[in-house]
Amino acid sequence: MDFYHVKDVPHGEVRSRWYTSKVTGQTRHIMVYTPPGYDADREKRYPVLYLQHGGGEDETGWVRQGRMNFILDNLIAEKKAVPMIVVMEKGYAARAGAAPQPQPGGPGRGDGGAFEDVVLKDLIPMIDSAYRTRPDRDNRAIAGLSMGAGQALRIGLTHLDTFSVVGAFSGGAGKANPKTAFGGVFADPVGFDKKVSLLYLHSGTVGLDAGIHKGAKALYEMLQQAGVKNVAFRDLEGQGHEWQTWRYALNDFAPRLFQEKK
């Protein structure tokens, strides 16, 4: 239960950064976690996890409430997870000159895909130029919680030339049809498994997560029946739509990332 506590281990650094978005025409703020030793070895490059918050939150949520930096520090110190960069962006966007959104929305839910374009056209190129990343799909993952889970699924699964791992915590699965969902990405199970090293679904079991759990489990079972192998489903019994659930999700998800294929 202490996996998200501050321990006597090497610590990474959480960096606050501003950058200019061509999509929105505005300056945007992000949080970037760099792992222990990032500044010591100027030659080493790292894989990147793009990690999204939920509705009503912002790019600081995963650090201030999720304690993601301490979770990663501890996993890396225990050699359970590989050192990685984690990027946290604000999940709302409007195109330059567009009217403000009446309600916050993820990709395909009112912003006309603006946030999706921010990630693909602005954020990733900036991160790859500003940090020592491994700039290829095999070393790039996207995940999120609640609203961010839906964003991760849509952006990740419809851009498999960019991402090889997709994670959804407490959201996004719904009643997806394996043959048509996300542009039909699941229609060819063998092809999907060649491109995606992991599709990870996680949920609590009570409160708001009770319905989400049902949908995520159903999608997982349908994908397994369809022949998709690189999909995992985990739940946290007795926990709901809350940060404790998502801390556990990240703690289980991160060790699965960027491992060498056996």
Placement of each model-derived feature along the sequence:
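Non-catalytic cap/lid and distal C-terminal segments of serine-dependent acyl enzymes
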Residues: 1-262
